[in-house]
Amino acid sequence: MGNEQKMIDRIIADAKQEAQEILDKAKSEADLKVNSANEKAEKEMASYTKLAEAEAEKAASKEISGAYMEAKKQILSKKQEILEEVILEAKNKLLNLKDNEYEEIILNMIEKSNCTDDSEIVLSKKDKKTLKDVLSKKGIKVSDETRDITGGFIVKKGDIEYNYSFEAIIAVEHEYIEQIAAEILFN
């Protein structure tokens, strides 16, 4: 039995050694697969992190851009508001001139207008009371008709009218006035 026992022990030892080799090989392959999976996961995580950072940067940039545009709109709106106030103030100053200054401006405007001998000047009720005699003395025909204008006049030649009221002049020259006011105020 001695030989048989030795042979059995040897078979068992060989089997244990072979089993250990198989286990070591399997463990080595498993470690390789785990390491490979970890590397892949880290690469994907880095990729997702970069992507998330890029998306966050894009969102932040979009937010900043939106805020910048909103600020520009508010600034532009405020500038427009200031310009409108300047134009309104200019119109009010024209309307609140002393009588002799207002009269002089109206006379200068009439001289520069296309007023001829066959035309007549239409004024507001207020201006007709204060300017009719002055204009008549200068040989300017004042119409019996009045218009609802706050300042200035209308030149009437038959059926054709040329509107020199302050409202009409400001409306026509609004863009030019805005440009000048903007240069003065914002440069």
Curated annotation (Swiss-Prot):
Signal peptide: none annotated. The keyword Ion transport applies. Keywords: ATP synthesis, Hydrogen ion transport, Ion transport, Transport. It holds the Pfam family vATP-synt_E. One of its GO terms (molecular function) is proton-transporting ATPase activity, rotational mechanism. It comes from the Bacteria. GO terms for biological process: proton motive force-driven plasma membrane ATP synthesis. One of its GO terms (cellular component) is proton-transporting two-sector ATPase complex, catalytic domain. Belongs to the V-ATPase E subunit family. Produces ATP from ADP in the presence of a proton gradient across the membrane. This is V-type ATP synthase subunit E.
